[in-house]
Structures are given as C-alpha cells and as structure tokens.
Amino acid sequence: MARYRHSRSRSRSRYRRRRRRRSRYRSRRRRYRGRRRRRSRRGRRRGYSRRRYSRRRRRRY
C-alpha cells in the first residue's frame, strides 16, 4: 500500500505543475480575490501596477 500511495501522489504533483503553467493568469486572478482581505497592500499593489503600466505603455508607444 505504501508504494502505491507514493506513486499516486507523484503523478498528481506532476499533473498539477503542468496545469499551472497553462492557466497561470486565471489561477492568479482567483487567488487575489480570496486574499484581498488578508494581504490588501500587496495584492492591490501588484494588480494595479501590472494593469496600469501595461495600459500606459501601450498608449504611449
């Protein structure tokens, strides 16, 4: 039973890593919604900085 259990956990971790690379932006959005109350300063700074800077750069150039 121990060997079967270990092999199963390894396969799951590999699948999760592959899935995270594809849906990285979506997973981050959901995390910020849930962690807004706990980390309000960090979450707001990161979200606003990335969105605003991207819009400004596109308009300038």
UniProtKB/Swiss-Prot annotation:
Major place of residence: nucleus
Domain of life: Eukaryota
Gene Ontology CC annotation, any one: nucleus
Region (Disordered): 1-61
Cell compartments where the protein resides: Nucleus; Chromosome
GO molecular function, one term: DNA binding
Swiss-Prot/TrEMBL GO biological process terms: chromosome condensation; sperm DNA condensation
Family note: Belongs to the protamine P1 family.
Protein name: Sperm protamine P1
UniProt organism field: Dendrolagus goodfellowi
Lineage, top ranks: Eukaryota, Metazoa, Chordata, Craniata, Vertebrata
